[in-house]
């Protein structure tokens, strides 16, 4: 993954116009300090589209903001999809919100496909990635009419195949298992399949999770002290931030 593509898949709030703070809804029980419907500016958003409490989000009860990641979709939506226009200049914020969700999904798929290609190259995965890189530069209408469900399903299958190649045969499979609150300190999870596993509050301290597949695993409140994650597959910043 070249420097340009790596940067494209990393959020740069300074190049955005606070889109997630306006377009997306949030609730108190999801780690936000208030309830807000979509397409309404956050009460902490300043006139320059910066956050007024960014340095103290967690302390002030806004941990949901600290763990949210758009994977670079926000700045791309601002600069390319809407040609530099901010949400203040767009008439249909509902459409813009839907486009942001589409772009975020594209960017997240690309992030994982690029990792899969880096760890275990596959022509089919590379071809899908190029298709998605092209689609992300499309206009709002094309993005909203694209069959993202089919693309997401194909992406999931290719990532699953890459995961098996990297992890090797015979490793434990706990995909989508409910392991919330479990004491997993003695479990053999090296190279395990933990895709979509519920690991809320689980004790993973000191566990070797390389190269375990953590795609979509819920790590909220998990104890990761001393956990070996260097080689883990498909682990994102928001997952770590939620632990």
Regions from the language model: what does each represent?
Residues 160, 164-243:
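Tandem repeat scaffolds
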Residues 1-120, 127-143, 147, 151-154, ...:
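Hydrophobic scaffolds flanking metal-cofactor catalytic centers in soluble metalloenzymes
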Residues 125-135, 174-183:
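Amphipathic alpha-helical surface "interface" segments used
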């Amino acid at each position: 993954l070249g420097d340009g593509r790596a940067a494209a898949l990393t959020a740069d709030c300074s190049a955005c116009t606070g889109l997630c703070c306006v377009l997306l809804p949030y609730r108190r029980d999801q780690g936000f300090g208030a309830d807000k419907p979509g397409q309404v500016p956050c009460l902490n958003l300043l006139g320059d589209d910066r956050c007024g409490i960014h340095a103290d989000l967690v302390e002030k009860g806004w941990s949901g903001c600290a763990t949210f990641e758009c994977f670079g979709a926000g700045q791309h939506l601002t600069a390319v999809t809407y040609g530099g226009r901010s949400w203040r200049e767009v008439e249909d914020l509902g459409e813009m919100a839907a486009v942001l969700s589409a772009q975020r999904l594209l960017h997240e798929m690309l992030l994982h496909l690029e990792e899969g290609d880096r760890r275990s190259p596959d022509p089919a995965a590379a071809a899908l990635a190029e298709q998605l890189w092209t689609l992300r530069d499309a206009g709002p209408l094309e993005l909203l009419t694209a069959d993202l469900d089919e693309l997401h399903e194909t992406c999931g299958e290719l990532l699953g195949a890459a995961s098996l190649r990297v992890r090797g045969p015979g490793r434990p499979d706990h995909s989508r298992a409910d392991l919330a609150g479990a004491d997993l300190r003695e479990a053999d999870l090296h190279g395990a399949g933990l895709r979509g596993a519920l690991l809320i509050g689980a004790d993973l301290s000191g566990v070797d999770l390389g190269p375990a597949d953590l795609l979509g695993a819920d790590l909220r409140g998990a104890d990761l002290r001393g956990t070996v994650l260097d080689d883990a597959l498909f682990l994102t910043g928001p997952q770590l931030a939620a632990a």
